[in-house]
């Protein structure tokens, strides 16, 4: 099981930039403060709405039932929490956790406007230091969040700690396309079109430039699978979606 200590005074990546690890969380949070109000709209525009299909597939693979306790980690504006709240019912609970208070407030407002009031709770916290006891959750899900974490392995260890035996982890994020042609087209779209959309819609091209770069710095499908295995998870598998542009990793804690 992973027990590596976090080293201080090290360098990590923020997109394609090298930055001291201690400021990455601040830089990432600043990005999401800037894009928060246009986040849902930009997701629909950038992915042509396909992100909703990817998230629905995550829900279908989650095996969440009535009465379950679910952690929507880095849950942002709450797309997964909306769906999980229906699955867990009145006897269950969903924790929508995000490190960014602006995103969290928008998520809370969105869910309340939908009438989701009782079985979703909201917590601002860092994924590397989850404020929960061991063996708390039946399911932990992360949707397009892991690539923004400073210490991915530490976060995965924390997830392992708070999952109950038999609990399931699901990680949905952008990944590596499976064909060279798709990679070329995807790169052209990502680097030349997405920042322009961000400038027009959100008046912020730099934040979307970072988001594009962060995708390229994220571990590929096999690397992430091995990272998850190294923590102690079992039955790790992944599903490529839209030619590998996104991938869903699933694993269990036994």
UniProtKB/Swiss-Prot annotation:
<feature type="binding site">
    <location>
        <position position="77"/>
    </location>
    <ligand>
        <name>S-adenosyl-L-methionine</name>
    </ligand>
</feature>
<comment type="similarity">
    <text>Belongs to the class I-like SAM-binding methyltransferase superfamily. MenG/UbiE family.</text>
</comment>
<comment type="pathway">
    <text>Cofactor biosynthesis; ubiquinone biosynthesis.</text>
</comment>
<feature type="binding site">
    <location>
        <position position="98"/>
    </location>
    <ligand>
        <name>S-adenosyl-L-methionine</name>
    </ligand>
</feature>
<protein>
    <recommendedName>
        <fullName>Ubiquinone/menaquinone biosynthesis C-methyltransferase UbiE</fullName>
        <ecNumber>2.1.1.163</ecNumber>
        <ecNumber>2.1.1.201</ecNumber>
    </recommendedName>
</protein>
<feature type="binding site">
    <location>
        <position position="143"/>
    </location>
    <ligand>
        <name>S-adenosyl-L-methionine</name>
    </ligand>
</feature>
<dbReference type="GO" id="GO:0008425">
    <property type="term" value="F:2-methoxy-6-polyprenyl-1,4-benzoquinol methyltransferase activity"/>
</dbReference>
<dbReference type="InterPro" id="IPR029063">
    <property type="entry name" value="SAM-dependent_MTases_sf"/>
</dbReference>
<dbReference type="Pfam" id="PF01209">
    <property type="entry name" value="Ubie_methyltran"/>
</dbReference>
<dbReference type="InterPro" id="IPR004033">
    <property type="entry name" value="UbiE/COQ5_MeTrFase"/>
</dbReference>
<feature type="binding site">
    <location>
        <begin position="126"/>
        <end position="127"/>
    </location>
    <ligand>
        <name>S-adenosyl-L-methionine</name>
    </ligand>
</feature>
<dbReference type="GO" id="GO:0032259">
    <property type="term" value="P:methylation"/>
</dbReference>
<keyword id="KW-0831">Ubiquinone biosynthesis</keyword>
<comment type="function">
    <text>Methyltransferase required for the conversion of demethylmenaquinol (DMKH2) to menaquinol (MKH2) and the conversion of 2-polyprenyl-6-methoxy-1,4-benzoquinol (DDMQH2) to 2-polyprenyl-3-methyl-6-methoxy-1,4-benzoquinol (DMQH2).</text>
</comment>
<keyword id="KW-0489">Methyltransferase</keyword>
<dbReference type="GO" id="GO:0009234">
    <property type="term" value="P:menaquinone biosynthetic process"/>
</dbReference>
<comment type="pathway">
    <text>Quinol/quinone metabolism; menaquinone biosynthesis; menaquinol from 1,4-dihydroxy-2-naphthoate: step 2/2.</text>
</comment>
<keyword id="KW-0808">Transferase</keyword>
<dbReference type="GO" id="GO:0009060">
    <property type="term" value="P:aerobic respiration"/>
</dbReference>
<keyword id="KW-0474">Menaquinone biosynthesis</keyword>
<dbReference type="GO" id="GO:0043770">
    <property type="term" value="F:demethylmenaquinone methyltransferase activity"/>
</dbReference>
<dbReference type="InterPro" id="IPR023576">
    <property type="entry name" value="UbiE/COQ5_MeTrFase_CS"/>
</dbReference>
<keyword id="KW-0949">S-adenosyl-L-methionine</keyword>
